[in-house]
């Protein structure tokens, strides 16, 4: 479990493609007091640290994870958001983020204080004004929604301390809706579906 508060923006320094998986090495300056088995959010993707060589953190990526996330498009030099898993007693500064990416969205416009995204169809029911969403692992509040387009308000601190400061229009991002919102919407949809069946 994560909080959506990014602790470091790090650089992908190594990519090793295998037949049905891949290995990535991320150069981190701050989050190096870790051991194999530690859980990380890498751009919102829950990954397990396999090994550490000085400042280089190694993660294995499954075929399923590649299919559902932007990690398959990484190149050497890609900047990624890192967060260690929440531990007992840690402050939850954002919202609970599972690290299970549900879809890939696209940045369609960038303004001084706002960023606009196009959401994949499967996430549209869970994108509600003033609700939470994790974008590349960052806990953000949704400002406005129109169909599959929504905006978030960004303060300069968020741009400076996350990979969003490196993103351009057209970039793809990992999206995970707020789990509480998703559970409530799914429950309501299931209730109405069962009601229709019973008629």
Curated annotation (Swiss-Prot):
Lineage start: Bacteria, Pseudomonadati, Chlamydiota, Chlamydiia, Chlamydiales
Keyword Cytoplasm: no
GO molecular function terms noted in the UniProt entry: riboflavin synthase activity
Annotated protein name in UniProt: Riboflavin synthase
GO terms, biological process: riboflavin biosynthetic process
Assembly notes: Homotrimer.
Native source organism of the sequence: Chlamydia trachomatis serovar D (strain ATCC VR-885 / DSM 19411 / UW-3/Cx)
SUPFAM superfamilies linked: Riboflavin synthase domain-like
InterPro entries linked to this entry: ATP_synth_asu-like_sf, Lumazine-bd, Lumazine-bd_dom, Riboflavin_synthase-like_b-brl
Binding positions for 2,4-dihydroxypteridine 2 per the UniProt entry: 46-48, 60-65, 99-101, 130
Keyword hit for NADP: no
